[in-house]
Amino acid sequence: KIIGIDLGTTNSXVA
């Protein structure tokens, strides 16, 4: 899941 969308794409892929 792309969680970075909420945090600002920087953390995308974190999971």
Curated annotation (Swiss-Prot):
Keyword field contains Chaperone: yes
Gene Ontology MF terms in the entry: ATP binding
Domain of life: Bacteria
InterPro entries for the chain: Heat_shock_70_CS
Induction pattern: By stress conditions e.g. heat shock, and by the herbicide dichlorprop [(R)-2-(2,4-dichlorophenoxy)propionate].
Keywords: ATP-binding, Chaperone, Nucleotide-binding, Stress response
Record's keyword annotation contains RNA-binding: no
PROSITE patterns from the UniProt entry: HSP70_1 (PS00297)
Function: Acts as a chaperone.
Family membership: Belongs to the heat shock protein 70 family.
Protein name (record): Chaperone protein DnaK
